[in-house]
Amino acid sequence: MKNIYLASLCVVLFAASSQMCVAAEPAKPTQVEIVMKASFKDRGQAKVDRLNQDETQRLCTQYPDKRPKAIASKIEAINMKLMKYPADGKLLGDWKEGEKIAQSGVGKQFSDDPTRPAGGNCYACHQLSKEEIAFGNIGPSLYHFGKLRGNTEAIQKYTFGKIYNAQAYAACTNMPRFGHNSILTEEQIKHVTALLLDPNSPVNK
Protein backbone atom coordinates (compact mmCIF):
# COMPACT_ATOMS: atom_id res chain seq x y z
CA MET A 1 0.00 0.00 0.00
CA LYS A 2 2.86 2.31 0.90
CA ASN A 3 4.53 1.65 -2.45
CA ILE A 4 1.30 2.41 -4.32
CA TYR A 5 0.93 5.69 -2.40
CA LEU A 6 4.50 6.74 -3.17
CA ALA A 7 4.10 5.83 -6.81
CA SER A 8 0.88 7.86 -7.05
CA LEU A 9 2.54 10.82 -5.32
CA CYS A 10 5.43 10.68 -7.76
CA VAL A 11 3.03 10.72 -10.72
CA VAL A 12 1.17 13.73 -9.30
CA LEU A 13 4.37 15.63 -8.58
CA PHE A 14 5.77 14.83 -12.02
CA ALA A 15 2.58 16.01 -13.70
CA ALA A 16 2.52 19.21 -11.65
CA SER A 17 6.17 19.95 -12.30
CA SER A 18 5.66 19.33 -16.03
CA GLN A 19 2.80 21.83 -16.11
CA MET A 20 4.89 24.36 -14.21
CA CYS A 21 7.74 23.95 -16.68
CA VAL A 22 5.41 24.43 -19.63
CA ALA A 23 3.81 27.50 -18.05
CA ALA A 24 7.15 29.05 -17.14
CA GLU A 25 8.75 28.44 -20.54
CA PRO A 26 9.06 31.81 -22.30
CA ALA A 27 7.88 32.27 -25.86
CA LYS A 28 10.57 31.68 -28.42
CA PRO A 29 12.14 34.94 -29.59
CA THR A 30 11.29 34.12 -33.19
CA GLN A 31 7.60 33.78 -32.33
CA VAL A 32 7.61 37.11 -30.50
CA GLU A 33 9.40 38.79 -33.38
CA ILE A 34 6.90 37.43 -35.89
CA VAL A 35 3.94 38.74 -33.89
CA MET A 36 5.53 42.14 -33.24
CA LYS A 37 6.69 42.69 -36.81
CA ALA A 38 3.28 41.66 -38.11
CA SER A 39 1.76 44.41 -35.95
CA PHE A 40 3.93 47.21 -37.35
CA LYS A 41 4.74 48.60 -40.76
CA ASP A 42 6.99 51.34 -42.08
CA ARG A 43 5.41 54.78 -41.76
CA GLY A 44 7.52 57.70 -42.83
CA GLN A 45 10.76 57.80 -40.85
CA ALA A 46 9.45 55.25 -38.34
CA LYS A 47 10.74 51.98 -39.78
CA VAL A 48 10.07 48.41 -38.65
CA ASP A 49 13.82 47.88 -38.25
CA ARG A 50 13.53 49.79 -34.97
CA LEU A 51 12.29 46.49 -33.54
CA ASN A 52 15.68 44.91 -34.19
CA GLN A 53 17.59 44.74 -30.91
CA ASP A 54 21.31 45.28 -30.47
CA GLU A 55 23.28 43.36 -27.86
CA THR A 56 22.46 45.86 -25.10
CA GLN A 57 18.73 45.63 -25.73
CA ARG A 58 18.83 41.83 -25.96
CA LEU A 59 20.59 41.58 -22.59
CA CYS A 60 18.17 44.02 -20.96
CA THR A 61 15.26 42.00 -22.34
CA GLN A 62 16.81 38.78 -21.07
CA TYR A 63 17.40 40.28 -17.60
CA PRO A 64 14.56 42.80 -17.10
CA ASP A 65 14.76 43.04 -13.32
CA LYS A 66 17.54 41.69 -11.14
CA ARG A 67 20.42 41.20 -13.54
CA PRO A 68 23.76 39.72 -12.46
CA LYS A 69 26.46 42.27 -11.73
CA ALA A 70 28.61 40.75 -14.46
CA ILE A 71 25.85 41.34 -17.03
CA ALA A 72 25.36 44.96 -15.91
CA SER A 73 29.10 45.56 -16.13
CA LYS A 74 29.17 43.99 -19.59
CA ILE A 75 26.39 46.27 -20.83
CA GLU A 76 28.12 49.37 -19.49
CA ALA A 77 31.46 48.31 -20.99
CA ILE A 78 29.87 47.68 -24.40
CA ASN A 79 28.35 51.14 -24.45
CA MET A 80 31.40 52.93 -23.09
CA LYS A 81 33.29 51.62 -26.12
CA LEU A 82 30.63 53.19 -28.34
CA MET A 83 31.04 56.63 -26.77
CA LYS A 84 32.03 59.46 -29.12
CA TYR A 85 33.19 62.80 -27.75
CA PRO A 86 33.54 65.97 -29.85
CA ALA A 87 36.69 66.04 -31.96
CA ASP A 88 37.21 69.71 -31.08
CA GLY A 89 37.28 68.86 -27.37
CA LYS A 90 34.53 71.38 -26.59
CA LEU A 91 31.71 69.92 -24.52
CA LEU A 92 29.62 73.00 -23.74
CA GLY A 93 27.30 74.84 -26.10
CA ASP A 94 24.62 77.48 -25.53
CA TRP A 95 22.34 76.79 -22.59
CA LYS A 96 19.54 78.85 -24.19
CA GLU A 97 19.51 76.45 -27.12
CA GLY A 98 19.69 73.60 -24.64
CA GLU A 99 16.50 74.81 -22.98
CA LYS A 100 14.69 74.78 -26.33
CA ILE A 101 15.86 71.23 -26.96
CA ALA A 102 14.81 70.14 -23.46
CA GLN A 103 11.33 71.59 -24.02
CA SER A 104 10.83 70.04 -27.46
CA GLY A 105 9.28 66.61 -27.87
CA VAL A 106 9.35 66.73 -31.66
CA GLY A 107 11.23 64.14 -33.66
CA LYS A 108 11.57 60.55 -34.89
CA GLN A 109 7.81 59.90 -35.02
CA PHE A 110 6.13 58.98 -38.30
CA SER A 111 4.15 62.23 -38.22
CA ASP A 112 7.22 64.44 -37.68
CA ASP A 113 9.09 66.20 -40.47
CA PRO A 114 12.39 64.26 -40.75
CA THR A 115 14.15 67.40 -41.98
CA ARG A 116 13.49 69.17 -38.68
CA PRO A 117 15.88 68.60 -35.76
CA ALA A 118 14.54 66.39 -32.99
CA GLY A 119 14.09 67.57 -29.44
CA GLY A 120 15.22 65.90 -26.25
CA ASN A 121 11.88 66.12 -24.42
CA CYS A 122 13.90 66.20 -21.19
CA TYR A 123 11.07 67.68 -19.13
CA ALA A 124 8.97 64.58 -19.79
CA CYS A 125 11.15 62.70 -17.29
CA HIS A 126 13.04 65.32 -15.28
CA GLN A 127 12.62 68.54 -13.37
CA LEU A 128 15.22 70.99 -14.66
CA SER A 129 14.26 74.55 -13.77
CA LYS A 130 12.14 76.14 -11.07
CA GLU A 131 10.10 78.07 -13.63
CA GLU A 132 8.82 75.02 -15.51
CA ILE A 133 6.21 73.26 -13.38
CA ALA A 134 5.16 70.68 -15.98
CA PHE A 135 7.72 67.90 -15.67
CA GLY A 136 7.85 64.14 -15.25
CA ASN A 137 9.43 62.07 -12.50
CA ILE A 138 10.53 58.91 -14.30
CA GLY A 139 14.07 60.23 -13.94
CA PRO A 140 15.65 62.14 -11.04
CA SER A 141 15.36 65.89 -10.62
CA LEU A 142 18.17 67.72 -12.43
CA TYR A 143 17.48 71.04 -10.73
CA HIS A 144 20.79 72.52 -9.51
CA PHE A 145 22.65 69.79 -11.43
CA GLY A 146 25.70 71.94 -12.06
CA LYS A 147 25.42 73.93 -8.86
CA LEU A 148 25.79 70.74 -6.83
CA ARG A 149 28.47 69.08 -8.97
CA GLY A 150 30.56 71.95 -10.27
CA ASN A 151 31.69 72.54 -13.83
CA THR A 152 35.02 70.73 -14.02
CA GLU A 153 36.27 69.05 -17.17
CA ALA A 154 35.50 65.64 -15.65
CA ILE A 155 31.90 66.67 -14.88
CA GLN A 156 31.48 68.09 -18.38
CA LYS A 157 32.71 64.83 -19.90
CA TYR A 158 30.44 62.75 -17.67
CA THR A 159 27.40 64.92 -18.46
CA PHE A 160 28.00 64.88 -22.20
CA GLY A 161 28.56 61.12 -22.07
CA LYS A 162 25.44 60.47 -20.02
CA ILE A 163 23.34 62.28 -22.61
CA TYR A 164 25.15 60.65 -25.54
CA ASN A 165 24.81 57.10 -24.19
CA ALA A 166 23.39 56.63 -20.70
CA GLN A 167 23.79 52.84 -20.92
CA ALA A 168 27.53 53.35 -20.42
CA TYR A 169 26.83 54.54 -16.88
CA ALA A 170 23.64 52.72 -15.85
CA ALA A 171 22.82 49.38 -17.46
CA CYS A 172 19.28 49.09 -18.80
CA THR A 173 18.37 52.64 -17.83
CA ASN A 174 15.13 54.08 -19.23
CA MET A 175 17.04 57.07 -20.59
CA PRO A 176 17.39 57.10 -24.39
CA ARG A 177 20.82 56.88 -25.98
CA PHE A 178 20.45 60.29 -27.60
CA GLY A 179 23.80 60.42 -29.37
CA HIS A 180 24.34 56.74 -30.09
CA ASN A 181 20.92 56.44 -31.72
CA SER A 182 21.28 59.76 -33.58
CA ILE A 183 18.29 61.33 -31.84
CA LEU A 184 20.30 64.46 -31.03
CA THR A 185 23.30 65.79 -32.91
CA GLU A 186 26.67 66.42 -31.26
CA GLU A 187 25.94 70.15 -31.26
CA GLN A 188 22.56 69.62 -29.60
CA ILE A 189 24.13 67.47 -26.89
CA LYS A 190 26.63 70.26 -26.23
CA HIS A 191 23.73 72.67 -25.77
CA VAL A 192 21.93 70.36 -23.32
CA THR A 193 25.20 69.82 -21.44
CA ALA A 194 25.48 73.60 -21.10
CA LEU A 195 21.88 73.78 -19.89
CA LEU A 196 22.81 71.44 -17.04
CA LEU A 197 26.16 72.99 -16.14
CA ASP A 198 26.24 76.68 -17.06
CA PRO A 199 25.91 78.79 -13.88
CA ASN A 200 23.67 81.22 -15.80
CA SER A 201 21.26 78.46 -16.80
CA PRO A 202 17.86 78.39 -15.03
CA VAL A 203 18.78 74.87 -13.95
CA ASN A 204 21.39 76.31 -11.59
CA LYS A 205 19.55 79.39 -10.32
Where in the sequence are the language-model features?
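Post-cleavage N-terminal segment of exported redox proteins
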Residues: 3, 14, 19-108, 162, ...
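Secretory-pathway/luminal and periplasmic proteins that interact with or process carbohydrate-rich
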Residues: 108-111, 131-135, 202
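Positively charged n-region of N-terminal signal peptides that target proteins for export
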Residues: 1-7
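Local sequence-structure signature of Cys/Sec-based thiol-disulfide redox active-site neighborhoods
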Residues: 110-121
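Generic anion/oxyanion-binding catalytic loop in active/binding sites
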Residues: 86-87, 111, 178-181
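Extracytoplasmic electron-transfer domains, predominantly the class I c-type cytochrome c fold
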Residues: 30-31, 38-41, 93-97, 123-124, ...
